[in-house]
């Protein structure tokens, strides 16, 4: 949300600091700034504001970026990298969905790398080259060094992907004020420019990812109600649909890398022309001299991509459900991303939301404009009425508790930055260490969530079970990066960890984690109840058996027999999977041992008072 506060170090400065907003996109990238109170996108020497997110490695240290690299893509596909954003923070095992890519993938340290004529190159390095060009463009246009930048990322980027983006910026010589979710950046641009109020949906279909955000806009306040999306769906998939159609029309298959790249470029061009005209003709000559000639109509294109269009609406429904809203509650729909220029997208969005979507701002530029506004604020250039934008985390962050349960500490869709704390205690007498397992996900059992990190808190003073107080704090910063601290309250002993996963979630995992939380909600609740009852039953059994060992002599034979029988029934119930049966057996044992507990208390008091004089007791 937007609040009347400022981040540390972002106060008003006596002189204006140069700051930019960068949309590091899958297909194109842009850089924008606030100049003379106007937010503008900066162009190159030829006046072009869009920089193709394409990098070509020539060897001997030579590199081409942007239009030059894109022009050579067809003839040198193995060394020319497009849509590299899809590989940020990913491991080799995550690339199953990227069949057909012409690159030579190799496993790197925590992230996939590309084998090129210039050696092994990581997606971070490729992204850094794009950022360098944007940085140089801004420096030349603004006439000075940059104080920093706000860089946008898809809302569904996890910690590893966000960290990879920050690493790329560092390589490019950029100070990152913060990372900002792309749909949220668009909302900043639309909300501030139009002073709009109400609940809005931001439909963001970029080259490689799809995001939907539901935001509540009021005067001076932007609150993100919910986010959802598909990290493996974007304009590239629509290009591929045209590509597959062209292959089918020509009867060809098994094209060489260069021919496949050439045809994919032609497919993208045809798709873009169909946004302006009703037909597009493809006429492409392959390396063997054969030609692929076909005319694609807008209607046929709509049929080819109907499944993809429909696929975008599933996350939209989930986001509305998460926000507790109906379609009628949405005042307007903002379109973001060049892919939203397609008529089939605009028609589908209009039909779903029963209203014409907003297209006042250029969908290619709107994200960069919003990022520039935020950068201007964080640079300290905006005096009076400053606002701060807070995003939300897309997946819940939790901790493993006894029985393999996931205790959610920061629920999904919580606004960030945020700090949440919860107290835990020890399970055994004299316990001096505790293992902290940090997890991410929506399921009730840790086995169904994603493990982020493990660390230990040592040096806990020996106490009776349940006496120690361990406070676990989760801090998520404005970039979505997590720090976890565990501290024992009486001694002050502390342990902490910064969570930076070695690589990110696969495309399938990101979509599955939220989907499964809905599909298995009832089963998960039953599983959680079962584990909770088993944990409580185990505690009761241990306590009862310990009491019988120490003070069993306080019971009659008949009373002892009742408690032993109760223990046997509870242990038998624990071998099954009926949580209610375990609870009933535990309740029965508790009730049967109530009188015994009272006698033990009386016995302990009597033993403590034996031999004491009244004066020593203050009587």
UniProtKB/Swiss-Prot annotation:
InterPro entries: ATPase_NBD, Heat_shock_70_CS, HSP70_C_sf, HSP70_peptide-bd_sf, Hsp_70_fam, ISC_FeS_clus_asmbl_HscA. One of its GO terms (molecular function) is ATP binding. It comes from the Bacteria. Pfam families: HSP70. Keywords: ATP-binding, Chaperone, Nucleotide-binding. GO terms for biological process: iron-sulfur cluster assembly. Chaperone involved in the maturation of iron-sulfur cluster-containing proteins. Has a low intrinsic ATPase activity which is markedly stimulated by HscB. Belongs to the heat shock protein 70 family. This is Chaperone protein HscA homolog. The gene is hscA.
């Amino acid at each position: 949300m937007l609040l009347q506060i400022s981040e540390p170090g972002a106060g008003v400065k006596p002189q204006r600091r140069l700051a930019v907003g960068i949309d590091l996109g899958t297909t194109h990238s842009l850089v924008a700034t606030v100049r003379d109170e106007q937010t503008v996108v900066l162009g190159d020497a030829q006046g072009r504001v869009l920089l193709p997110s394409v990098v070509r490695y020539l060897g001997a240290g030579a590199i081409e970026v942007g239009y030059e690299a894109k022009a050579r893509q067809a003839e040198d596909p193995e060394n020319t990298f497009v849509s590299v954003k899809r590989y940020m923070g990913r491991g080799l095992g995550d690339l199953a969905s990227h069949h057909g890519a012409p690159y030579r993938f190799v496993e790197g340290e925590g992230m996939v790398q590309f084998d090129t004529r210039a050696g092994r190159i990581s997606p971070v390095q490729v992204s850094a080259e794009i950022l360098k060009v944007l940085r140089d463009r801004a420096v030349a246009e603004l006439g000075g060094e940059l104080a920093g930048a706000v860089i946008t990322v898809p809302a569904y980027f996890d910690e590893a992907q966000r960290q990879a983006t920050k690493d790329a910026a560092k390589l490019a010589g950029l100070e990152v004020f913060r990372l900002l979710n792309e749909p949220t950046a668009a909302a900043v641009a639309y909300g501030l420019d139009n002073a709009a109020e109400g609940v809005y949906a931001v439909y963001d279909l970029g080259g490689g990812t799809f995001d939907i955000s539901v935001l509540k806009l009021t005067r001076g306040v932007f609150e993100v109600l919910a986010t959802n999306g598909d990290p493996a769906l974007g304009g590239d998939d629509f290009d591929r649909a045209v590509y597959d159609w062209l292959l089918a029309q020509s009867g060809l298959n098994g094209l060489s890398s260069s021919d496949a790249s050439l045809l994919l470029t032609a497919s993208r061009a045809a798709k873009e022309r169909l946004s302006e005209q009703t037909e597009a003709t493809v006429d492409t000559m392959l390396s063997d001299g054969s030609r692929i000639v076909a005319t694609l109509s807008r209607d046929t294109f709509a049929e080819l991509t109907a499944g993809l269009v429909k696929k975008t609406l599933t996350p939209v429904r989930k986001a509305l459900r998460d926000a507790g809203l109906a379609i009628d509650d949405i005042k307007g729909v903002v379109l973001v991303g060049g892919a939203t220029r397609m008529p089939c997208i605009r028609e589908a969005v209009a039909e779903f939301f029963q209203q014409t979507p907003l297209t006042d701002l250029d969908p290619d530029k709107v994200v960069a404009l919003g990022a520039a506004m935020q950068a201007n604020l964080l640079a300290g250039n905006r005096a009076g009425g400053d606002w701060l934008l807070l995003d939300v985390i897309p997946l819940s962050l939790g901790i493993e508790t006894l029985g393999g349960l996931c205790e959610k500490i920061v629920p999904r869709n919580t606004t960030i930055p945020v700090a949440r704390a919860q107290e835990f205690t020890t399970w055994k007498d004299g316990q001096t260490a505790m293992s902290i397992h940090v997890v991410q996900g929506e399921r009730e059992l840790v086995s169904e969530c994603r493990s982020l990190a493990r660390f230990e808190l040592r040096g806990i003073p020996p106490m009776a079970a349940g006496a120690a107080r361990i406070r676990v704090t989760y801090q998520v910063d404005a970039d979505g990066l997590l720090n976890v601290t565990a501290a024992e309250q009486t001694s002050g002993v502390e342990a902490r960890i910064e969570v930076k996963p070695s690589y990110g979630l696969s495309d399938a995992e990101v979509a599955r984690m939220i989907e499964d939380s809905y599909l298995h909600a009832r089963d998960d609740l039953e599983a959680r109840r079962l584990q909770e009852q088993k944990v409580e039953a185990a505690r009761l059994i241990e306590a009862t058996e310990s009491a019988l060992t120490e003070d069993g002599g306080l019971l009659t034979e008949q009373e002892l027999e009742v408690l032993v029988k109760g223990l046997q029934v509870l242990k038998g119930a624990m071998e099954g999977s009926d949580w209610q049966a375990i609870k009933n057996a535990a309740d029965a044992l508790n009730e049967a041992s109530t009188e015994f507990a009272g006698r033990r208390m009386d016995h302990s008091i009597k033993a403590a008072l034996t031999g004491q004089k009244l004066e020593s007791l203050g009587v």
